[in-house]
Amino acid sequence: MECCRRATPGTLLLFLAFLLLSSRTARSEEDRDGLWDAWGPWSECSRTCGGGASYSLRRCLSSKSCEGRNIRYRTCSNVDCPPEAGDFRAQQCSAHNDVKHHGQFYEWLPVSNDPDNPCSLKCQAKGTTLVVELAPKVLDGTRCYTESLDMCISGLCQIVGCDHQLGSTVKEDNCGVCNGDGSTCRLVRGQYKSQLSATKSDDTVVAIPYGSRHIRLVLKGPDHLYLETKTLQGTKGENSLSSTGTFLVDNSSVDFQKFPDKEILRMAGPLTADFIVKIRNSGSADSTVQFIFYQPIIHRWRETDFFPCSATCGGGYQLTSAECYDLRSNRVVADQYCHYYPENIKPKPKLQECNLDPCPASDGYKQIMPYDLYHPLPRWEATPWTACSSSCGGGIQSRAVSCVEEDIQGHVTSVEEWKCMYTPKMPIAQPCNIFDCPKWLAQEWSPCTVTCGQGLRYRVVLCIDHRGMHTGGCSPKTKPHIKEECIVPTPCYKPKEKLPVEAKLPWFKQAQELEEGAAVSEEPSFIPEAWSACTVTCGVGTQVRIVRCQVLLSFSQSVADLPIDECEGPKPASQRACYAGPCSGEIPEFNPDETDGLFGGLQDFDELYDWEYEGFTKCSESCGGGVQEAVVSCLNKQTREPAEENLCVTSRRPPQLLKSCNLDPCPARWEIGKWSPCSLTCGVGLQTRDVFCSHLLSREMNETVILADELCRQPKPSTVQACNRFNCPPAWYPAQWQPCSRTCGGGVQKREVLCKQRMADGSFLELPETFCSASKPACQQACKKDDCPSEWLLSDWTECSTSCGEGTQTRSAICRKMLKTGLSTVVNSTLCPPLPFSSSIRPCMLATCARPGRPSTKHSPHIAAARKVYIQTRRQRKLHFVVGGFAYLLPKTAVVLRCPARRVRKPLITWEKDGQHLISSTHVTVAPFGYLKIHRLKPSDAGVYTCSAGPAREHFVIKLIGGNRKLVARPLSPRSEEEVLAGRKGGPKEALQTHKHQNGIFSNGSKAEKRGLAANPGSRYDDLVSRLLEQGGWPGELLASWEAQDSAERNTTSEEDPGAEQVLLHLPFTMVTEQRRLDDILGNLSQQPEELRDLYSKHLVAQLAQEIFRSHLEHQDTLLKPSERRTSPVTLSPHKHVSGFSSSLRTSSTGDAGGGSRRPHRKPTILRKISAAQQLSASEVVTHLGQTVALASGTLSVLLHCEAIGHPRPTISWARNGEEVQFSDRILLQPDDSLQILAPVEADVGFYTCNATNALGYDSVSIAVTLAGKPLVKTSRMTVINTEKPAVTVDIGSTIKTVQGVNVTINCQVAGVPEAEVTWFRNKSKLGSPHHLHEGSLLLTNVSSSDQGLYSCRAANLHGELTESTQLLILDPPQVPTQLEDIRALLAATGPNLPSVLTSPLGTQLVLDPGNSALLGCPIKGHPVPNITWFHGGQPIVTATGLTHHILAAGQILQVANLSGGSQGEFSCLAQNEAGVLMQKASLVIQDYWWSVDRLATCSASCGNRGVQQPRLRCLLNSTEVNPAHCAGKVRPAVQPIACNRRDCPSRWMVTSWSACTRSCGGGVQTRRVTCQKLKASGISTPVSNDMCTQVAKRPVDTQACNQQLCVEWAFSSWGQCNGPCIGPHLAVQHRQVFCQTRDGITLPSEQCSALPRPVSTQNCWSEACSVHWRVSLWTLCTATCGNYGFQSRRVECVHARTNKAVPEHLCSWGPRPANWQRCNITPCENMECRDTTRYCEKVKQLKLCQLSQFKSRCCGTCGKA
């Protein structure tokens, strides 16, 4: 830790202090302040605006040391600079404008955002690329980066948060609020899809309001975006966004990017105006716009100041409230605006005590009482709980809670709720009756009622409550059945009665009931007791009886009483009328007549009411067969008026009559199923449903058939729909786990977890992690928690056991095991695999020990190295090498590397690879005998191998050759080859310098980079070897075939080329050359001129290849017997060289004459030989093909040699510039087929080609003859047209016509001495680097119309230049244009009122009436302009007869007039040019409608007498059914219905209409009659037994619940006190609560009573507190005697009318408040001398406001003296 010295003045002290600041530890300074003096004052700010820095110093008071910092910094002047201030960094750069830099003045501009040193002052000279660091650091307070608040202090960039504090990391949220939580804005995202419209050219995409941030819109499609703006002042603007760039629109920066298929619009914000993004439709296709931005919440809650105190003295309280504030208009608005945003949380009111001073003894109005000092706070008060909404199963009970205030007299009044918000509001609802509802409990079944066959069994079902008590209240609908059938396995032999009692006739059953008393059964039933005696002894009285609900318990054979609601069915009458005879007092004498009269009168009384039929009810169905029921009414026979049904005798009620109705079949209709659940909960899911066309044949049989969809006339409802089309909330989406980091011992596996949001269109949007509120799933987890197998842990080698001579080194081994917890533990050594002895002990060798008394001579070890280079050409299993050289080998070869060391023991030899010690492994064997073996080479084996024998060291470099004869890139190694080879014996520095010099041999500018030259000595021969491998050093075709692993491929190669096997017999496995030979070549090349170096390098490489082959063949020839040498001629066919140079190796001089028939047939091959370099001054030039001849003034003769081999012997011919050479006395063909030119002239310049031909093929080689070395270009004068091939290649000078999308290669073969440099031009402009240039050729990939033009190749060297050109024409085949507006406009102009149609490749159709004319358009584009030919019915239209037509607009429009049936059909236009053809079609159809009678429709009924079949009548157009309205004018065929299915119908249930509900609310019952009827073929419906219908269908229900809604009503409380707001003199408002409740008093939501008229909840009332009015005082004196600035004021207050005391102003708010100030003395001043016009001028002067014009003019006198 450095000491803190005493502060001394100067910049050096500040600099050192800041260094101390950066080196201090992070301990708190407060712990160490005891030795420090107090902090000094803050320095002045480094800037006056824009954010600067200020510092403070302190000194150390101790003589020892003080820990901590002696300087501290803070930000200052954090206010925005005015626009004219400019950039702070730019000001510092401009300060150097008057200082010369290198003797010249510059205008300096700032260079910002330097990633390496942002706090240095780097500036750029205006108008140049010169960038200079003018100062090592900028002034304190300069921003590090333009888009960051971080600032530079003492040359270092310090972090600054958005709170402008140093070291703060707080940032702005998406709303622009520093350290905000994002609650002041909301994310808006959406998608807009344009709709093609002929009448609508543009549309609004989205409106982005003022203040929005982070806006991004992406348009995909052909349409175009543009902007409309509107500022807060109402100024409107528009920006068309015509080009890519960054614009300033209404002071908002807009970044716009325009692409061929999309447009991107970005605005960082905040926006300074309202932006409306609009889209301009192009009309070609739909476009989609996706947008996202953060919209500010402009309405926010704002906490108010405290309200006035509730008491003026003696202690009161005051509260705050919250008001909704509009940030745009800066005004308070209604609260509903803030409730619109869920993010807005209304602040809770704050409460504080106030006016705690005691009240004065008397204020003149009242005597102070003790209770005046007590003022209780408002409180919540609740009403009693209402009755529970449910008697069981959990209900709700509620109460009203209101805020009340108690005055000093104890009167309680309701006040606004906000006054009680300082405490939690009491709950207004709570659960109640949460115990279970009564449930049905079924007991065990009784035994079967029969002993054989089928019978019945019964059980008791009781309603049990939650305490286990028998009670009522269970739902009858859910009651389990109490009776079921049972079968006894014993058969019955007694004949049974055919019909059960239930099936007997009604009157027979009634007789049975009268005769038999009701008996108790095992099913609950009503059991009436006997009638009581008549209540009177004479006359008409009543009788009563008890009716019980009883059940027979079969298991106990006892009768149990049940609640009445346990029995089903109507309850028997418990009361009836009775007649006890006349009440005359005398016993009459029996008189039959009188008796008849008496009882006859009673009979007449009974017969006064009777049942009668009154028509039928409405048909129950509108189609498909319904039923009508005869209406039976009880009528008064005398008045014929309806009476109550109980007045008629029930037993005499006539039977029910039913008849069928509306038997016509229902039309086919769509049957729609229910929607399935949505497949997704958000982010657009799908719902499906079944929709099918059905036809109801018979309602009584419920017979329905499914029809084809086209038979339903109505449009088919949708079977699928989107659902939940809203954005999902952001959620975490984890990816798959990655593989474990370990295979055992406890590893870790990771995965990527992204925060994404599934959008309403199904796509996913990746969001920042802060958007996902849920906890983030784990990104990593433990894995492979099992223990690892035991392994050896080896220590370092110990020192040698001796100080000289031979010794040993040892190391220890520990058996270690990695546990699943990740910790290691030592285990028993038996658990580890056996350890080789060599792994724990090895020999070591130090300096030889000196023998005492005898002088000795030191002989250091020596390694016999071989300085050779090896190049493997054929696969071989194993190769042996000696260290000291370089080897370029094929993969999978085994290598044995020997280290022949002398004067050292073999076991002491050690091996290294790339500087790392090598030990034996399964792949590399380090033998103790001084050699190293590598098994099957792989790329990682490439590198530098070093053998060490004591101080002696030798290296061996191994590199691999890939399958494409390229050197394999070496993997990364810890040490470079340069570092390893630098340790070679014999001066590493000199070797390195020599290597670096030789590396430059192949480099001339960019070519060195292109060849990838080596950067270390281990790669110095790589370029030569690569050239040998790539440029035909030996027959590559034979090598490639031999490299194949499959022996079958070798056999194939031998069969195809019989000479290949002979060549391979003489081809070496490895080519060997001396390193010094390669060093000589590199040295020779370094001495050549730079422009000829590449040319000679190719020459020397080819000679090197010949030498290698020749030395190998000569060595092999000496090993063969003479006979073998005579019969083994080998000729190696050369490999064509890129540059024209080649090597020719002939190992037999027998020529073509030798061998005779023994030689195999082979194609011609011209031998490429290398001649000596031509001397320009030679008079006779003799050369071989493949070179360049330069004609000089002294050249007398040129001899061009052409030697070819092949069998049969090839024929030689010569050509010049592609044309056959015309021999003359000056141009001669020699006997050896050489071409000689005597006295060459300029006309002889050109490319001469030797062609060798026999029956098997041909070969050709060219040679260039130039004039004095001038450039020569091989040209071709031909036109190439390409429409199909993917690539085309031509020589310069040709004309190319090709379609788009192909690759075009233009060859520019040049010659000249020195070699000419090629430059390409397009339309006389030089082509840049992006074009593909290779060896003089120009490659144009994927050509388009923009590539069309004139391409020129210029060849230039020291002797001149030559330019040749090729014209490239892009053909565009005929195709349909994407924009059809032009052809449509052409059709509209040709025939404005004529129907028209455009042709298309797939064909279009136009339907016309007979006699009309039509226009057919053929939209086409192409280059050249296609020629259009029209056809009709496949024949040229010019040959069509009977067709009136005109061809217009150069063939693009065909007008056909007076169409008829013969002229309709297919019209086609054929467009063709050089690039292709296109056929488009359109059909003209003459429409004609007619009626068609089809098959009979389905029978309208399946039975009965109403079934008919109607013949189906359809309106057709060209055999296609259309709307029948089209056939309205056609004669309709007469059709007659046919009767069908006239037979008896099976029995079916007939139901009547439902009766009226028994209750209007609270749950009632509806009933209807259900009978079994049978419809005869005659149409008569008769009742039958119910069993006949039960077999067909289940009996319909005859009772159902209705009007289940609760019975509700409005209820209200009593009127509250008259303490509401004043609305006039003496008038206030009082309130009462109005709520919805059931008749039982249960409170319900108000919506339940919405159908009922709601009582008023407020009314006006008389209030003494509202006896108030505004009182004003007199106006004060005017503040000025003249001018425009005088004003006067007065006091305005609200006072009580009786007491004349001031009261709160809100009590007078019902009337307008008088003005409390006004202008005055608005008259011009008479004299214009400088004087004050207001009395406030002294304050103006004290506040230094005189510089403001409005104050200076009014205080002229005072400010003039200032």
Curated annotation (Swiss-Prot):
PTM description: C-, N- and O-glycosylated. O-fucosylated by POFUT2 on a serine or a threonine residue found within the consensus sequence C1-X(2)-(S/T)-C2-G of the TSP type-1 repeat domains where C1 and C2 are the first and second cysteine residue of the repeat, respectively. Fucosylated repeats can then be further glycosylated by the addition of a beta-1,3-glucose residue by the glucosyltransferase, B3GALTL. Fucosylation mediates the efficient secretion of ADAMTSL1.
PLAC domain span: 1726-1762
Sequence segments annotated as region (Disordered): 1120-1164
Origin superkingdom: Eukaryota
Outcome after substituting S391A: Small increase in secretion of ADAMTSL1. About 40% increase in secretion of ADAMTSL1. Dramatic increase in secretion of ADAMTSL1
Residues annotated as domain Ig-like C2-type: 861-963, 1164-1266, 1286-1369, 1395-1485
Consequence of changing W39A: Significant reduction in secretion of ADAMTSL1
Disulfide-bond pairs as recorded: C45-C76, C49-C81, C60-C66, C534-C578, C538-C583, C549-C567, C678-C723, C682-C728, C693-C712, C800-C844, C804-C849, C815-C832, C899-C947, C1202-C1250, C1308-C1353, C1418-C1469
The keyword Chaperone appears for this protein: no
Pfam families: ADAMTS_CR_3, ADAMTS_spacer1, ADAMTSL1, I-set, Ig_3, PLAC, TSP1_ADAMTS, TSP_1
Main location: secreted
Cellular component, GO, one term: endoplasmic reticulum lumen
Any one GO BP annotation for this protein: extracellular matrix organization
Assigned keywords, A-Z: Disulfide bond, Extracellular matrix, Glycoprotein, Hydrolase, Immunoglobulin domain, Repeat, Secreted, Signal
Subunit annotation: Monomer.
Protein name: ADAMTS-like protein 1
Organism listed in the record: Homo sapiens (Human)
